């Protein structure tokens, strides 16, 4: 047989679809397996090889699970709201709906050409009204429970996309969407109180099977710290500045304070500040900087002392200067910090620049050269002097703070509440109404979905308002509470909204009355295995875990955690070893590979190219190597025989079953495929194999290269579809060689080798060794003093 991929691949894709072999059943008696991949954003560029790698791991696992007798849910959908589509719509004048539908159709066809075993009956699209009705419903439940609030604050704003970005979407001072520079802008922002779930998100990590680096990234992102809130009086006025510190034991070393340029105390007491012009000029400069620019550790320290306001150190009563500096943000902590320059390098650099006192309170370093950040004995600290353990000194200081009413133990999180609105058209409308009498009111549930109006102008306003603000028929409404004339919220949700619960909808995608039926949720949830990219383990995974915990508290879902297990794929790099990008001209189109070499070749190569979790460069020669391997697989039909294979080959066959089965579960796809390549060499060397042995081989290969394996299965008369046949089982006894080759030593020197039965008794081993002509020649004419046998390893004769 020949590997005629252009003929057989569409043939088997049609047969799978006709037989509905990949459709999950909601009422099966089989054990369930829910495998999930991160659903794609359907861009105009279509699918790239990164998608193939991302989906291939659970494609292989899901195909194996079906053959193991599981009822498998392996769904796909499209995360289709978002700015790239809207920006393209603005550029071309084409409605985002049309663009999205075309892109989804193209993407679906591409995925089908590769032969992925997705359940196409459960496809979801986050832009579908029947889907985003439930996204809006979840949002309203959060609003109802007080998890939604609005605040006017400085936000990260992308002038190019004309949209507010969360901290997560503007890392490095760049827009995550268009990569242009982000600026700070004062705006009204809707937030979700994700910080209320910080502890649950941390605790939940104990109950899931995530790689350690994924857990650590989430722990770091949430950034829980234990410390103290401490009040500093401001001299001469009835005002306190609250700070948060993880090192309250260093309070005696506080020699100045720094507050954010936006801190309200500045405007409140402007008449007492004698250098207000200087302060105002500095604040104006800060307003031009992004948060990233302001908080960089490696930069020149800038700041201005507030003349006319001084703080008072609460533990020693000393007056200390107050500065404003750009590195302190109102959105972090309390907007004010205490500075201990002897033991914090940034404070040290600031103090050196502005000539501020530096007081050592922890022995161990040379503060004339740099800050000492290690542990040591407390000094210059009154009642803490002599304490050597940080834990003890912190506890003692907390006692003092609480006794005097000037501070208390507290917890802070690096993670901030989630900025949840965008000033663009192509997103879920936020279902809230602004009433002059009732304030902010929820759209009644029976009126959901609140549909996006059909518009021709998608351009956001220069004033930072959403395109929806220009549509009077959408904006103007009546208050559902009092009937007064009111206005709808015109911002839309971020793209992260739809992806925060999509895995639930797959369990019941056509339900008009609930986001999913509870019985179906109880059957399918949690997701057994979720694979995706490292770039999504913080934002998307934390957001979706937050939503899921909330729905669990609400009684809508049956498990606190959505994903039982998580795995990560590495990048596919260009042939030059660089990250693939159009600008570098090193992008590989997967459909070009399908056209030239076949889908099975593409599937096999993507998993053979290297460690699944590592970044690996593309190699056209290795693609050709995988094609040759599949050509050889097809050729196995030409050496079918009634004759049994040798014991040696039977052993290698059972070892391969064991290895491939294990390697798949451990994501060692490259070594699984390599073992099949080795086995085909052994089979070819033997010159023949039986139908039963060929069946085992193609079953092991089928999750990787299902089309050619189905074709061979049909050729040899297999019943039904190979995709749902039984996964091979190995016989442990047959994985053990019947004979072993061992070395024979005479007086400590290896003189030859012998073949003995596996597990051979020592007397038999000695007998075989002595019967060997070469060994016998070294023993001839000598007296045996000692005979030594290490089972299955070596025979040693000591002779004189």
Where are these regions (language model features)?
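Alpha-helical recognition segments enriched in aromatics with Gly/Pro capping
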Residues: 309-332, 361, 475-614
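N-terminal catalytic cores of NTP/NDP-binding nucleotidyl/phosphoryl-transfer enzymes
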Residues: 25-96, 123-138, 245-246, 313-350, ...
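Glycine- and acidic
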Residues: 38-47, 119-124, 329-337, 379-383, ...
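Secondary-structure transition/capping motifs at alpha-helix termini
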Residues: 63-71, 91-97, 109, 113-117, ...
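Residue patterns forming the tRNA-binding/recognition surfaces of aminoacyl-tRNA synthetases
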Residues: 2, 11, 15-19, 91-241, ...
């Amino acid at each position: 047989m020949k590997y005629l991929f252009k003929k057989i691949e569409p043939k088997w894709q049609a047969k799978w679809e006709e037989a509905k072999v990949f459709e999950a059943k909601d009422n099966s008696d089989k054990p369930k397996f829910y495998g999930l991949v991160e659903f794609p954003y359907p861009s105009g560029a279509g699918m790239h090889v990164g998608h193939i790698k991302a989906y291939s791991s659970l494609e292989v696992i899901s195909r194996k699970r079906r053959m193991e007798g599981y009822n498998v849910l392996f769904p796909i959908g499209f995360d289709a709201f978002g700015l790239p589509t809207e920006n393209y719509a603005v550029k071309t004048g084409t409605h985002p709906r049309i663009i999205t539908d075309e892109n989804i159709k193209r993407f679906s066809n591409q995925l089908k050409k590769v032969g992925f075993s997705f359940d196409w009956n459960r496809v979801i699209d986050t832009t579908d009204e029947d889907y985003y009705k439930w996204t809006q419903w979840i949002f309203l439940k959060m609003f109802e429970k007080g998890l939604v609030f609005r605040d006017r604050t400085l936000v990260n704003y992308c002038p190019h996309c004309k949209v507010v970005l969360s901290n997560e979407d503007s890392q490095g001072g760049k827009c995550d969407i268009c990569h242009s520079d982000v600026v700070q802008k004062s705006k009204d922002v809707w937030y979700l109180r994700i910080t209320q779930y910080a502890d649950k998100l941390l605790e939940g990590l104990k109950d899931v099977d995530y790689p350690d680096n994924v857990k650590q990234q989430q722990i770091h992102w949430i950034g829980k710290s234990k410390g103290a809130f401490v009040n500093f009086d401001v001299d001469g006025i009835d005002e306190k500045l609250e700070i948060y510190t993880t090192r309250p034991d260093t309070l005696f070393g506080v020699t100045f304070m720094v507050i954010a340029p936006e801190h309200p105390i500045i405007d409140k007491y402007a008449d007492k500040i004698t250098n207000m012009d200087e302060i105002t000029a500095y604040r104006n400069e800060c307003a031009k900087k992004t948060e990233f620019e302001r908080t960089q550790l490696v930069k020149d320290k800038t700041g201005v002392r507030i003349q006319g306001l001084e703080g008072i150190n609460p533990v020693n009563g000393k007056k200390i200067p107050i500065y404003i500096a750009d590195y302190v943000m109102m959105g972090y902590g309390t907007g004010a910090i205490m500075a201990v320059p002897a033991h914090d390098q940034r404070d040290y650099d600031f103090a050196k620049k502005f000539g501020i006192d530096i007081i050592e309170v922890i022995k161990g370093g040379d503060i004339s050269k740099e800050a000492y950040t290690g542990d040591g004995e407390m000094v210059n600290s009154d009642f803490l002097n002599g304490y050597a353990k940080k834990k003890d000194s912190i506890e003692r200081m907390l006692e003092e703070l609480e006794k005097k009413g000037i501070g208390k133990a507290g917890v802070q999180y690096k993670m901030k509440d989630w900025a949840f609105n965008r000033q663009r058209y192509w997103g879920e409308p936020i279902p809230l109404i602004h009433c002059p009498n009732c304030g902010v009111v929820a759209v009644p549930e029976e009126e959901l979905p609140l549909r996006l109006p059909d518009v021709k102008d998608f351009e956001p306003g220069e004033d930072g308002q959403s395109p929806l603000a220009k549509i009077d028929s959408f904006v103007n409404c009546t208050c559902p509470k009092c009937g007064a004339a009111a206005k709808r919220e015109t911002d839309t949700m971020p793209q992260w909204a739809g992806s925060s619960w999509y895995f639930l909808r797959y369990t019941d995608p056509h339900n008009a009355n609930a986001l999913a039926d509870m019985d179906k949720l109880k059957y399918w949830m949690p997701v057994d295995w979720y694979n995706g990219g490292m770039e999504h383990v913080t934002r998307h995974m934390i957001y979706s875990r937050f939503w899921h915990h909330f729905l669990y508290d609400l009684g809508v879902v049956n498990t606190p955690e959505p994903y039982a297990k998580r795995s990560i794929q590495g990048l596919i790099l260009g042939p030059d070893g660089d990250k693939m990008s159009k600008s570098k001209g090193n992008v590989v189109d997967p459909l070009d590979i399908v056209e030239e070499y076949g889908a099975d070749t593409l599937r096999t190569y993507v998993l053979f190219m290297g460690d699944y979790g590592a970044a690996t460069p593309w190699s056209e020669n290795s693609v050709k190597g995988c094609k040759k391997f599949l050509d050889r697989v097809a050729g196995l039909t030409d050496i079918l025989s009634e004759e049994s294979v040798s014991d040696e080959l039977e052993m290698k066959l059972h070892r391969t079953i064991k290895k491939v089965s294990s390697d798949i579960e451990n994501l060692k796809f490259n070594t699984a495929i390599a073992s099949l390549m080795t086995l085909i060499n052994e089979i070819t060397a033997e010159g023949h194999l039986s139908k039963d042995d060929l069946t085992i081989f193609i079953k092991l290969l089928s999750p990787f290269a299902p089309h050619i394996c189905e074709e061979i299965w049909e050729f040899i008369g297999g019943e039904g579809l190979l995709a749902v046949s039984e996964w091979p089982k190995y016989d442990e006894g047959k994985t053990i060689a019947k004979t072993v080759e061992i070395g024979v030593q005479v007086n400590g020197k290896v003189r030859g080798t012998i073949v003995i039965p596996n597990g051979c008794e020592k007397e038999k081993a000695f007998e075989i060794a002595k019967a060997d002509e070469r060994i016998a020649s070294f023993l001839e004419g000598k007296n045996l003093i000692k005979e030594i046998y290490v089972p299955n390893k070596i025979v040693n004769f000591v002779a004189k």
